[in-house]
Amino acid sequence: MRKSLKAAAAGAACAVAGAALYGAGVAGAGQSAANSTHEPYNIGQLVKDIDTYYGTTADADGVYLASPDSPYAKDLARIDAEAERYLDKAARTAHHRGARPAVVFDIDDTLLLSLDYEKRHNYTYDSATWNDYVNKADRPAVFGSPELVRYAESKGVEVFYNSGLTEAQRAGAVANLKKAGADVNLDAGHMFLKDKAAPPAYLKHCAVPGTWNCTTVQYKSGTRRHIEHDLGYEIIANFGDQYSDLDGGYADRAYKLPNPTYFVS
């Protein structure tokens, strides 16, 4: 379930400072659930803080973009640098053991930035406008993420994608990832999207044709389990902007990218 800024303001306020290595012994900047036991952070001030964090500017066409010298970009650069060091070592170790190393990337706000949509829609979600936005296939890349995809591939690491986007949004996602520079393994065997009409057998514990009861964690961790147990890979790293992208195991290490604009439980 995706919660708007208004529904998750308290949690987002804690996350605005950035992101961190998650699930590997290092505490993250943020929290996995909103805390509503006290007066929430003021929304007007939070929006200003978000603009400052992203260094939000509008281009000549009025599209809202993040600044490459913003605190957001600097947080991403730190995460990417650490991840590259880790991937280099972990890939060599896995290959030495005869394992098949893999990485998993979320798409929305992990590879493709949705800041323009969030700002235009006052940080609220609507399925129809979101679908139009995704299928327009014109989102900019999250700073450094396409380079990280290509870096993993260069180290002999198999790249997979695990997204909450739907099968109906596949063409838009593929076109946008190509445009953004993440043109690696964009086939259906490597990009896992939600198929509520015909869910895969490995999700039978929470989804059957026509009935989808999977939480985000069940869907994403179940897909990672499939990659490891059925496809025979060892997921050495998992990247996402939501804690629900990362929870549930089936990855040696997880990286939480910053996103203070919405919360997916």
List each model region and its residues:
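Non-catalytic pre-domain segments flanking phosphatase-related domains
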Residues: 2-105
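Second-shell loop/turn segments in exported
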Residues: 64-74, 131-139, 160-165, 209-214
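Asp-based phosphoryl-transfer active-site loop
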Residues: 101-114, 161
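Short, acidic loop-to-helix structural element flanking the phosphoryl-transfer center
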Residues: 131-160, 167-173
